[in-house]
Structures are given as structure tokens and as C-alpha cells.
Amino acid sequence: VSFKLARAVRRGLTNGEPLPDVFRSLKDRGIRFYRGGTVLVGGVPGSMKTMFIGHMVDTMKVPTLYISNDTNELDIISRYLARRTKQDSNIMRMKALKDPEWAAEKLSDMDWVRWNFNASPSLEEIEEEMMAFEELWGEHAHLVVVDILMKVDYYEDGGGSLEGIVRYLDKLARDTGSCIIIACHTSENEDGHPTQPLKAILNKVSKLSTLVLTTAYDGNTFYLAPVKNRNGFADSTGYSSIQFLVDPSTAILEELE
């Protein structure tokens, strides 16, 4: 249905609304997460994609749906307890198992995040979860995380299609006004310096997303590179990375700039 722009303004705008900024170094470069579109966060296994996304989720504090098909409940619980106590996540794992009431109380400040831990969710299930979120809370999730792309169950013409999944999720983002962050793998054949270039994103799934970030991890440093950014700075080579101090044991990131 077509309508006048004036009507769109009067009825309220959600698509294009930025989510809260978490890091000044990202905001200064125009790296922002907008509702109504998809964001890809790509890297090789062990490049701290999930830790970065988790930090963003925990700090933004907006209505969130998290599809965690690559990390189980106990690992997630351990990391968020570690962030709150600044103690090693392995210690928090044992603490959560021994004292679940204590762990539940510590995590009660995250009740605005809904979780789905299905190891192989279908696109239909993801859409149903998004609709259920809206029915429960009276509004669509401002942020949806799909972690990770390759474990979403989808078939097109008899074969899997990562591009088809992103296309479907991009439409869902536009229809609901959610920002959908999608974690994905990159090709290990593409060198990183230390972050990989845009072409390292597998299966050309980056075509639809307005923001694509690649990640790397070395020692106590986390690297994040904007290799595609419709609304700010980008360098497709991956050379222009932003550095963060990272403590994997407590899942905490700190800006170095």
C-alpha cells in the first residue's frame, strides 16, 4: 500500500531509528545499528563475534530477541554472570550449577531479553518468535540477534541458501522495525590484517545488509572493522580496524581510543 511521506511521519517512524550507542569510537565513525535493517558481524571461529554482540545486547538494554543456535544456555549464563561479577566464566559456570537461585537473581536485570536456544531453528520459527515477542510485550523487538547464520534451517529449490536466509531476515527487519544482527562465518582463505576484508564474507550474503563488520582477536585485543557501511565510514579491505581491550574470561570489552 502506497502513502504520502507526511503520513509516514505522522504515524511514527521506527525504520531507520538508531539503537543506543555503546562505543564512542563506533559512533564517531558513523557505525550505528539502525532499526528496520540487517547487520552482519563476520569472522573466523574464535574471533569473538558472540562476545562483541553479547556486550552490545547487555549494554543497549532495549527489547531484544536472541536466537542462540550456536551457544548453549549454560555457556551464555556463565558469560553474563561473569560480566556482572567480573569473575571468570568457568567459576560462574560452577556457581550457576550449585546455586541456581543466586544465578537467577543476578540475571533478573536481563528480563527484557527473550532467548531461543534451538540448535537449528527454521526461518518460520524465527518469524513466529518475533511475532510472539510483539504479542507478549506490545511492541516488536528493537533488536533481534541470530547467532549463527549457517545453523538456520532453510531450503530453497532443494538446496541450502545463506543468501536466501539473509534476504528473508532483511524483509522481516523492514516489516517489524527490528534491527537484526546476524553472526556469520568468513572464509579462512582470506588473510586478515588483522581483520578480514568484505570479500571474506561467505556466499555473498553481505549484499542486502547496510552494515557489515569483520572481527579478529589476538592476545588481549579485539579488532572490529567496518567493511561496509551505508551511513558512515567503511573500508572494504578490513585494514581500518578499531581496537578494544578484551578479557575473554569475563566477556568484557573496553575501548582503547
Which stretches of residues belong to each language-model region?
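Structured core elements
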Residues: 39-42, 65-68, 114, 145, ...
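Helical mechanochemical/support elements of P-loop NTPase systems and associated helical scaffolds
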Residues: 22, 72-76, 122-126, 145, ...
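Phosphate-binding/switch region of NTP-binding enzymes
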Residues: 27-29, 42, 46, 55-56, ...
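Helix C-cap/helix->beta junction micro-motif
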Residues: 60, 137, 175-177
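The Walker A/P-loop phosphate-binding site
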Residues: 1-87, 206
